[in-house]
From Swiss-Prot:
Chemical reaction(s) catalysed: L-methionyl-[protein] + a quinone + H2O = L-methionyl-(R)-S-oxide-[protein] + a quinol
HAMAP family according to UniProt: MsrP
GO cellular component: periplasmic space
EC number: 1.8.5.-
Annotated signal sequence range: 1-47
Cited InterPro entries: MsrP, OxRdtase_Mopterin-bd_dom, OxRdtase_Mopterin-bd_sf, TAT_signal, TAT_signal_bac_arc
Primary gene name: msrP
Protein known as: Protein-methionine-sulfoxide reductase catalytic subunit MsrP
Organism: Azospira oryzae (strain ATCC BAA-33 / DSM 13638 / PS)
Lineage: Bacteria, Pseudomonadati, Pseudomonadota, Betaproteobacteria, Rhodocyclales
Length: 312
């Protein structure tokens, strides 16, 4: 799918059908006036630089998707169902300071982190990752963040923790989409504990060397590059370590369409989108989709012996 949608493209072709049907109510909500809000992190000016970043050997050397596309074309249904809605509605609405993330559950050291605490948790790195949307388009994004494993090490999961659940902000005053029953808010995602501890799994606080824009999930979001983009929860406010597999938002919305693992797999199509190929934003010729989004060498061992058609 190209960054510019054809004028005759129906909403139901790019969003799940229940969301397309509820769109009118959401757009009505977006007409409400926005409260002024800051975008930057503490001690960092709005859209400010994140300073010197440590390069990462885990980065891709592929051509980057332009910043304008990364920040202007994305899914963030809390602000609207069109790709351009987050850029239109999130800046100036989403208050990202003060911000806290509560970490709780099956851990020895439960804690509520301020965004300043999180910024000091580990050296920030630039991670250039491929991002693959289940809708059949992709980008290459230079994220800034630190491994989720660093936070996990701080809170010390106990022997009962098997999964990690991520809960995002759901504030109808800031996020007009939350007023509409398009999804079961707040947005919830989850990972197996070993997936969360994998070196590739990132908590991102920026992109392109700058503070994370509101429309991209500020001030802190998850990035799991071998999974479809919807697994990477935005604007996280709570992280829970749990015994049972979390039931994610998209699993509730379409259990036959969205599985818990949601690993990029060209051999398993979504009911409405082929996963065999993808359109890299900014390119005109489709390219073949790689298993695990090209990260098979690093992560395939996590799923050894699993039927990836069944556990999609």
């Amino acid at each position: 799918m190209l960054i510019r949608r054809p004028p005759d493209l129906l909403p139901s072709e790019i969003t799940p059908e229940p969301l397309a049907r509820g769109r009118r109510a959401l757009l009505k909500g977006l007409g409400a006036g926005a409260a002024l809000a800051g975008l930057g992190l503490p001690q960092i000016s709005q859209a400010g630089s994140l300073g010197t970043l440590r390069p990462s050997p885990l980065s891709s050397d592929e051509k980057l998707t332009p910043l304008k596309s990364v920040t202007g074309y994305n899914n963030f249904y809390e602000f609207g169902t069109d790709k351009e809605d987050p850029a239109r509605h999130a800046p100036g609405r989403l208050k990202t300071r003060p911000w806290t993330v509560t970490v709780e559950g099956e851990i020895k050291r439960p804690r509520t982190f301020s965004i300043d605490d999180l910024l000091k948790l580990a050296p920030l790195e630039e991670r250039i990752y491929r991002m693959r949307c289940v809708e059949g388009w992709s980008m290459v994004i230079p994220w800034v963040g630190f491994p989720l494993a660093e936070l996990i090490r701080q809170v010390e999961p106990n022997g009962q923790a098997r999964f990690v659940e991520f809960v995002t902000l759901a504030d109808p005053q800031q996020m007009p989409g939350v007023r509409s029953p398009l999804l079961d808010w707040p947005y919830v995602e989850g990972l197996r504990l070993d997936e969360a501890q994998h070196p590739l799994t990132l908590l991102a606080v920026g992109l392109y060397g700058e503070v994370l824009p509101a429309q991209n999930g500020a001030p802190i979001r998850l990035v799991v590059p071998w999974k479809y983009g919807f697994k990477s929860a935005k604007s996280i406010v709570r992280i829970r370590f749990v015994r049972e597999q979390p039931r994610s938002t998209w699993m509730k919305a379409g259990p036959s369409e969205y599985g818990f693992y949601s690993n990029v797999n060209p051999a398993v199509d979504h009911p409405r989108w082929s996963q065999a190929t993808e359109r890299r934003i900014g390119e005109f010729i489709k390219r073949k989709t790689l298993p695990f989004n090209g990260y098979a060498d690093q992560v395939a061992g996590l799923y050894s012996g699993m039927d990836l058609r069944r556990f999609f």
